[in-house]
UniProtKB/Swiss-Prot annotation:
Residues 77-106 are annotated as: Disordered. One of its GO terms (cellular component) is SAGA complex. It comes from Selaginella moellendorffii. Keywords: Signal. It comes from the Eukaryota. Gene3D superfamilies: 6.10.140.670. Residues 1-13 form the signal peptide. Coiled coil: none annotated. Residues 134-201 form the SCA7 domain. Pfam families: SCA7. This is SCA7 domain-containing protein SELMODRAFT_439258.
């Protein structure tokens, strides 16, 4: 009895876990244990088609299931027109010109193009098949800044500036419709270009705010003392020493953590300074009169200075300018923090 049941019941394989049914059992297990066809193939072949029934193309369901779609395409192509071109692809038309052909009989796939035949190009297409670039019409403002000489082929005016080198000056002067003569417009054009180039060369200031009052009085006192000592030539320290001991004045002792470096160019002094009342390094310009009676201080904002500038200030060394008007000894007041720290990254 057990042997009979085992011959009729399906057996599960050990590796692939698929159901194995004997052919003479007559048991249908999940569509006969065969692989199901994907949805894309089901939509193409149909759901009610029999496996053993042949298709119109001469293929059965088993052939379609095995993936023989190339043979199906070949069969459809044979039904349409043998080994001809693919269905749905338009054929290219060859251009026929009776002047160039000797026999004068165009073929079936020829498009007659000649002196008697006219071909209409729609949607702004040219004879070469490319879309023409449509330019806007010229205005008076355009003629004042452009060449405007008409082209001998198309008749379109030249869109190059007034300094166009393709056309002569006489042809540019002959263009009508300008507000001013060509020479006046050309001079204005050159002046505008030169003015723009000059403005681009001028360096912009780091800031426009000037600190001249209030808490900046201490900074003024230090800058004035440094300047007068440098132009007087009376210094208590050697010239090769780059440090300056501040006076015993309590007002100047507050500047112990002040970093200054002076670069003397004629009568203009540029000072990089860090003071307790300034958040970061600031660039200060000091200008004096001939007698040295008046000191003008212009302090620029600190946030505009790059980080590498602060690192270079710790090892800044100055040289005496013997050719300057006031060639006195220059001293630099330096601090031990925080700018001599190599890990300092700036403002």
């Amino acid at each position: 009895m057990c042997f009979f049941l085992s011959s009729l019941c399906p057996v599960v394989a050990e590796r692939c876990r698929s159901l194995l049914v004997p052919e003479d059992s007559g048991v249908d297990v999940e569509n006969g244990g065969k692989r199901t066809i994907p949805k894309s193939r089901n939509g193409m072949l149909g759901e009610d088609m029999d496996d053993a029934a042949p298709l119109e193309s001469g293929l059965s369901m088993s052939d379609m299931q095995m993936g023989s779609f190339s043979t199906l395409k070949a069969a459809k192509r044979a039904e349409v027109g043998g080994t001809g071109p693919k269905v749905g692809r338009p054929r290219k038309l060859s251009v026929y010109n009776p002047r160039e052909m000797s026999d004068g009989n165009p073929g079936e796939d020829c498009l007659v193009v000649g002196p008697s035949a006219t071909v209409s190009h729609s949607e702004g297409l040219s004879a070469s098949g490319k879309r023409r670039k449509q330019h806007l019409p010229f205005t008076v403002d355009d003629l004042d800044i452009m060449c405007g000489v008409p082209s001998p082929r198309s008749g379109a005016p030249c869109r190059q500036p007034l300094t166009c080198k393709s056309h002569s000056i006489s042809s540019k002067r002959a263009v009508t419709g300008r507000r001013k003569p060509f020479d006046a417009l050309l001079q204005d054009f050159k002046d505008n270009n030169s003015r723009k180039s000059q403005q681009a060369d001028i360096p912009r200031p780091l800031a426009t705010k000037v600190y001249c009052s209030g808490h900046s009085q201490r900074m003024r006192a230090v800058i004035t003392s440094l300047y007068r000592e440098s132009i007087s030539g009376r210094s208590s320290l050697p010239q090769n020493e780059q440090t300056l001991a501040l006076d015993a004045n309590p007002q100047q002792q507050q500047q112990q953590h002040t970093l200054m470096s002076l670069n003397k160019v004629s009568e203009c002094w540029w000072i990089w300074i860090k003071t307790p009342f300034c958040s970061g390094i600031s660039m200060t310009q000091v200008r004096t009169t001939e007698g040295g009676d008046k000191v003008e201080v212009v302090l620029y904002a600190a946030a505009h200075l790059p980080a590498f500038t602060a690192r270079r200030l710790s090892g800044y060394s100055l040289q005496r300018n013997q050719q300057a008007a006031h060639s006195g000894p220059i001293h630099v007041a330096r601090s031990t923090l925080p700018f001599e720290n190599p890990d300092f990254t700036g403002v």
